[in-house]
Structure formats: structure tokens, C-alpha cells
Amino acid sequence: MQEHTKSSTLENAIALQKYGVGQPVRRKEDDTLVRGKGRYTDDFNLPGQAYAVVVRSTHAHGIIRSIGIDAAKALPGVLGVWTGKDLDAAGYGPFTCGLPLKSRDGSPLLQTNRQPLATDKVRFVGDPVAFVVAETLAQARDAAEAVELDIEPLPAVTDPEEAAKPGAPQLYDHIPNNVALDYHYGDMDKVNAAFASAAHVTKVDIENTRVAVVSMEPRVGLASYDKKTERYTLQVPTQGVAGNRANLAKNLKVPNEKVRILTANVGGSFGMKNINYPEYMCILYAAKTLGRPVKWLDERSTAFLSDSHGRAQKIHAELALDAEGHFLAAKLEGYGNLGAYITGVAPGPLSLNTGKNFSSVYRTPLMGVDIKVVLTNTTLMGAYRGAGRPEANYYMERLIDRAADEMGINRLTLRKRNFIKPNQIPFAASSGVTYDSGDFQAVFNKALEISDHENFAKRKKDSKKAGKLRGIAVGSYLEVTAPPSPELGKIVFEPDGSVQLITGTLDYGQGHATPFAQVLSAQLGVPFESIKLVQGDSDIVHSGNGTGGSRSITASGQAIVGAAKLVIEKGKRAAAHMLEASEADIEFEGGNFTIAGTDRSIDIMELAKRLHDGKTPEGVPDSLDVDHTSEPIASAFPNGCHVAEVEIDPETGVVQIVRYSAVNDFGTVINPLLVAGQLHGGVVQGIGQALMEHIRYDESGQPITGSLMDYALPRAEDVPNMTVGDHPVPATTNPLGSKGCGEAGCAGSLSTVVNAVLDALSEYGIKHIDMPLTSERVWRAIQDAKGKAA
């Protein structure tokens, strides 16, 4: 045993050098996915399955007079056609929002209580009104086209500001002026007094455009029902099976244990797949009614109508400063567009999250937020990468650049003057949260260094010689990650020598299996290769809060660390028995349980094997397995500074990002390779919104960007080379010191890219262009400026 232990100790030390915390280990799943061996939801089929197609409204607003289904039911292969009345009779629904948000008068968020299928009115183009199930997908499509809808059109409203005005079309009788939430934060008397005494006030009106999630695999559902056990099973892409099971069980009016959620490879989500949708209720109903599995798969064209969108705010922002440029107070006023229904966490990003993140890394003594969250005749809103954080940082950074220009203060100087200093941390921000860590000035300085900011003037001259405009922008960001919540941490030692790790978050592209294994390996000394992350089955992942809000490494990390401590406690009792020693004399280090002061030890994997192989007396654990739920931990505060340089062709308005740099503080980085991937992806997603992405509707509520022919996405040629640095200051809010990184790229890139374009256009006197800064918008702004000059 002693020789074995020495060998294993050396092996553990070598393994930690390769696979330990901080090492750039490649993702465990890469080989499978790169070779096309991943299994997405549409890859799953069940014997005897039928196919569903949803019938949707082509009107943005209207009264349902009748739904004719007889012709559709008579077509070959059709197994059933159902409307909202059928699902209402079954008692399904409604979909609600669980956030405890309140309006300024203390009243709760007004719910829309969405049913799976509309029965009285349709409220947006794409609103589900019926569904068809047939033997084949083609037959189901034919039958869906045969359903006859008689809808009396009503006036529609798509703009949240217009929707909140008296006399606007009303979506719900119980929600006056379509305002579901009149959100307020801050002491406005103090805020207004600060503005009244300010030497300078900067104001800017900003429209944060509506964007769509264009996931690699659209939404898909495969439903079945076991009559004997009265149990529903749904194969579906999600961001967390436990939470989705609970929500679905609530909608189905059954106990949680009567629902099983299965999730394999997700194919992208960015917040969109984290809620339950009407289509899932429809196929579960059909599976139970027909006694056979039913599959529904979305198409790209209908995904633009049915999937939740993101952003969509109209904001008036103000910043009050003294004569030296010190911030005195800041205000946000405006509207958030909820779309036609409220589900998931949609009101949060539009209100609470925007407010919590607005003060960013700056000393802003006072802050006021007034945002009306409004219903319109458009596709429902949801969380979208960052969920309020990129929006808030965008408003602050736009204000700072504008204030610097108006006051004649260098933009860099103004930022430096207002940074929260390290000796002021912990810092109680005016947004209501307390920052536990960070060195924002150091991050800023490093970003200037790696971007070669000091030589920008030379590069600008070179661009001018080539007939191009060149601009630069430097922007900081800070994110308040997801609110405190408990998380599952379960560890199972299998007889074959593998170690199952189970936690309530879910990997839908982040690569959790690798950093989670790195953390567990470091805690217990178990071989990295032996650790298998088990996820995507609510029968196994019985609790947990899913992936979202950049919480996975902090919440699951804490749960893993907590579970590992319990394993060590059990291991000490078992090792004391095996080594015939007192439990008090057992020490644990590097994967070995050792009798203190001796060389008698047993490796943790050997101990687990022996416990499997034999019986243990009373009081001695029969395994090292643990099932642990961690206590909620406070939010973390990832932050950073991005620098973007752009060139613009003034003859065409085409914008090219020619240099991009970012320095980030993600606290303790578990795997820098994965962090870089998350950062790059987030930056590109932000570039997409800044320069090209925009969901638009005409005045009647008809979408005019309903396909990839109309909705532009970044391509490889749009992605700049990135120079990335880091300046980690470990968080004090979790045992790993991590801060989360999944949404940081978006938070930094929106403002930086837009401000860089406006800097390039400053010689024309152009102060503002709303996103997206397409070549057409930039070209028109230049032409308008030339016309005014003439």
C-alpha cells in the first residue's frame, strides 16, 4: 500500500500540473462534436412517433371568430387537430413569470397568464392557435394549411412608448395602457437635487435594438406519455432540466415526479431555450391523448416568430457632473418592450438587471431608474446573452463619451477620474449591490497598453492617407451575475473506477465537463480522465438552477467544493477503519488518506474500490458517494476594459473593425482556454448587434426581418483578431474566487464598437447613431452631415 501511495502521489502531482485549476485543458467533448458525433434533440426518435405542426396567426392583433378544423381532420394520415379549448379543458397552463417584481406603487407585476394556444385573441404574428398531429411531417404540414382561421383584425402597436400612451391598442383588459410593470429604483428627490446642482448634465436618447437568437439547432421537442405510471417525458433543449421540469409540472398540474426532462446537446441557447413554450405543452397533450410519441421541430422561418427575442429598450439617459468631471448622479428613464406575453424572466433584464448594472465601475453617488415594461403586438421577450448587463454598460459608456466631448475633457481622463479605487472596495454602489473585489484602473491601464493606444494617432494618419476614417474607443464594463441561489453537487464513485459528477447547471456550449473536472480533481486528487459529468436527465439531476447569468462556475464550483469536503469527511471515517486508526489521526492531501506522522496511507480511488468490494461495519460509510446542495452565494462582479479600432469607407459607409483588445478580471480562472472561447464568442455577438442585427416590424405588426435573408449575422470576415489580457482579482464571494465569464464579451463590445464608429465620424460632427450601425445608416449620416455643412 505504501509503494502504491507514493506512486499515486507523484502521478497526482503530475496530473495537477496538466489538468489542475488554471491549466488550458481542451474540452472533453470537442472530439465528439468536431467529428459530428454529437446528439442534438432532432437526432432522437421513438418507435411509432407521430409529427406535430403548429398553426399560427398571420395577424398581429385580432379577435378569433372561429377555427375550422374539419377539413384538416379529414386529410390522410391526420391523427388529430386541437385548439386552445381542448388544452383549456385539460387544465393545462397558464405560463407566468415568477420574478417578484413590483411597480413603484408596490403592486406586483401584472401577469398575462398565457395559455398554450390562443382562444379569444391573437396578439402577435406567430401566435399559436391550433396544432395538427399526423403520421408524417408532410401530412401534418398539409393538414396545418387546411385549418381555416377567421380572425377579425384589430389595430396593433409595436413600439413600447406608443403602446403606453392613452388610446393605444390594448392587448389585455386588465393591464391599463399595456404597462405590466412601472419599475422604479432610487431616491429621486436626492437624484434630482444632484442634477439641479450639477455644473454639467449630459443627455442621450438611445434605442437598444431588438435582436433574435439564431441557435445552431432550432427548438425541438419529443414527447411521450406512460399510461401505467401516468408520467410525461419530454426530450427538449434546455438550460437546466430541474427548473424546466418544475415549471412544466406546474403547467401540466401534476407533481414534479410525474415529469421527466431529457436534454442532450443543445445547439446554442443564449437564454432563449430556458423557458417552456406552448409547443411543448401541445405535444405532451397529444402524446397522452394518442398514446404514442409526438415530435415537433421548429424551422428557421418560424423560429424568428416563436422564439423569445432580446434587448428592445428605448432609453433616455442622463449623467450629472461637477465642474471637474466627477460624477454626481445618473438617471435612466424609458421603456422596455415585453412583446405580447410575459413568461420566464423577461421583465427582469428590461428593468431590474438594467438598473443593477448601470453604475458599472464608476463612483456614481446617486442613481435613479424609471422604466415602464410594456406589452406590444410583437414576439415575446426573454433573456438574451447578458440579460440587462450589456444594455446598462452601453448606456453608461455612451454617456461618458458624450460628456467628455461636451466638457472638453479627455475621454480617458474622465474615466480615470471616476473609477472606484481598490482601497474603496468593498464598495456599496448606488445600484444597490456591494462590489467585493476589483482593480478597475489597473485593468484599464493594461487595456491601453496591449492595444497600443498611444500610437493610435499615427494609425489614424495612415488610414486617412488611404481614404479611410479611423476611430478608437475604450470602454469598461462590470456585470452583476445571477442572484444568489442554491446548487446541486453530487459525486458518485462507480465500480469501474469512474467518478460521476452531477450538478444542476447544464452545458449548452460552455464546456462544463472540463473545468468542473479540473475543480474536482484538484479538490480530491481523483484522476481528471476518470471524471464524467452527468447532466440532462431530471431523474438524476433532481434539483438545481440551471445555467444562466454567468453563474455556472461560481454556483456549481461552490457545490463541487462543498461535495468534495463531504467526500473527504466520509473518506476519513472509512480510511480510519481500513488503516485501523483513529479518525482524528487521518489526514487528507493530494488524493491520499494518511495516518498523521506515518507513511501508512490509502489512495482515495483505492478506498472507493474497497468500499464497493466489501461490507463495512456500522458507523463506517459503505461508499464515498455524496448528494449535496450548497447554500446560496452572493453575486460575483466580472469586469474588464475593451478597446476597439475601426476604419470606415466614407464613400460606402462600410465599417471594418481593424483592431480589438480586451483585458478582463474574471477572478480565479479555472481554464483560460475555455474563457478565451467564451470571451471571443461574446464579443462577436456584441459586434453583431452593434453593426448588423435588428428585428423590425411594420406599423401593422408584420415582421419584416423574418429570415436570414433579412436578418444579418456576423460572418468570419466580420470577426477581428483579438488581443486578450487578464488582470484577475479573486472574488471573495465563493470558494474558488471565480467571477463568471460567459456574457462578458457582449457587455464590453456593444459600447466599444459603437463609440469607436462615432469617434471616426466625429470630424463630420456626428454625435449619435442608433444600433445597428449598418453601412447604410453610416453612409446616410455622413451625407446628412455634409448637407448641413453645405
Q: Which positions does each model-derived feature cover?
A:
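Conserved catalytic cysteine-centered active-site region
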Residues: 119-122, 255-263, 286-299, 303
